Each structure stands twice: as C-alpha cells, then as structure tokens.
Amino acid sequence: MNHKLCCIGYITRDKIVTPGNTVYMPGGTAFYFAKAVSRLQAENFLLVTALAEEDRAAADDITNEGIEVKLVPTAHSHSFENIYGDNPNDRSQRVTAQADPFCIEDLKDVQADIIHLGTLLADDFSLEVIKHLASKSTLAADVQGFLRKVENEKVYPVDWAEKKEALKYIHTLKANESEMEVLTGCSEPHEAALLIADWGVKTVLLTLGDKGSLIYSGGQFYDIPAYPTLQVVDATGCGDTYMAGYLYKRSQGASYEEAGCFAAAMCTIKLQSHGPFNGTEEAINAILSGVKH
C-alpha cells in the first residue's frame, strides 16, 4: 500500500530532567512525530519504528490512537537521558542503550509519497538505506542524528562525513542553530541555507528557537515567526513536532510559508506542556489568526 506520509525512526526510552522536574516517558522523533500526526486530520500515515520486545507498549499506544505502525525487531531500544538548564534551547544528553540500525530488508515494503527520516544517532540510517528510500519516495530528514556521536554514553556533536553524498538524496532537511553550524561551519542562517542547498537539498528548514525559523526553497527565503508562549514547560520533541506539522501541510498542498507557520504554531502549543503535541487544528488555527490561546 502506498501511504501519503511516513516517518521512519526509533521510539526511545527517555528520562527528561528540567530544573523543576524529572519525567520518564517514551520519546524520539518517531514518537513525537506520530503523536503529533495523530492529533491532525492526517490520513494514510505510516510509522515505521524499532523497539525491544519489552518496550513495545509504546508502539501499541500509538496504534490505539489510529496510527498504522510497522514494528521492526531490535535487541535493544534507544535509551536517552535529556537534561535541560534554565534555557530550554540548551540540552545535554546521555545514551544508555542503542538499537540496531535500520536496513534495506526492514524497509523494502515501505511505500510513501513522503518519507521522513527521524534520525537520532549517526548509525540509524546508512547511505545505502538513504539511496534505497530516495529511489521510491521524496525524502525528508532531521539532521540531528547524523551529527551525534556516542562515546561512553555521552553524545558529542560531529560533522557528517558522508553529507555531500547523502544530501543529494534528501529533498527536505531540518536543522536547528547549533546543528546548522556543525553541518556548514556557518553561524548566519541565510548563508548556511544556501550552502546546504548547494549540496543538493531542495528545501532547507532552519529552526532558530524563539527567533522563529527560516525556510529556503526554489531560490527564495521565507521567514517564519515564533508565536509567543504563555510558558515554556518542555522543549523535548519540538523539532519533531515542527516537521510533523510542516510535512503534513505540504502533503496537503500548502505553500512553504503556510506550512512553516502551521508548524510554528504547533510548536507554541507543544512547548507549554510535558510530552508530545496534544493540541488540535482548531487551536493551531486560532494562534495563526491571532486569537489568544
């Protein structure tokens, strides 16, 4: 079956530590993306994830929300510890267990118009898997995992050795400010976007925290605002929420600017509570219309 939108990535076991609280919960791009999509009027969406048998309840929870899930077996689940300071844009991480990488055999029957690669660690998707998926779908990716190296449970930022080859196959790429600098060596978003586009990416999404986001596609820049929040409770999964909203709207035919603003409004709602996005399209549209939320 051909799906309209698909996310491939790991549901993780997360420990989230903030100055005022410690929370244990499922996490990872696959979790936050699928949970966000489940709150939208998305049809024909597929989640492909890998979990250890003892953690499969997290996938069952998503299935129970009406999302189709393909579960790939793995000996271990990715396990993360996310520690935030007073500034929610600053995060340190530990990785206490790693899952097996996705392989072509796992994904040969996956068919979708748009496939989002929810990377968490550099080994999640090989260049061969990226090429295979790009041969049958429009690929989107979050660059974060490709820039993360694990040593002694600590996560270190590293450049992506295969970026100039791999990015030829990725249509839409998202990076935050720090990832943008690691990937390109540029601290100015417009310069970074142009360089990423030179490497072959058709649409570049740069999320800039409370400064909003920048989209570059077809030779044009689009400045997307960050809508004000009442309070910032939990930033974990905000980038995944942004991508879910953006790709959902683009799959419906929305413009770059419309999709970006929709995604930004989703993030405003998500930031104000623990866990994944739990809002509605009505609440998103209220923010976009300037109605107090």
Language-model features and meaning:
Residues 10-11, 29, 241:
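Active-site metal-binding loops of divalent metal-dependent hydrolases
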Residues 118-194:
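Conserved beta-alpha-beta core of the PfkB/ribokinase-like small-molecule kinase fold
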Residues 28-39:
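Histidine-anchored nucleotide/phosphate-binding helix
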Residues 37, 176, 239:
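Short, conserved phosphate/pyrophosphate- and ester-handling motifs at nucleotide-, phospho-/glycolipid
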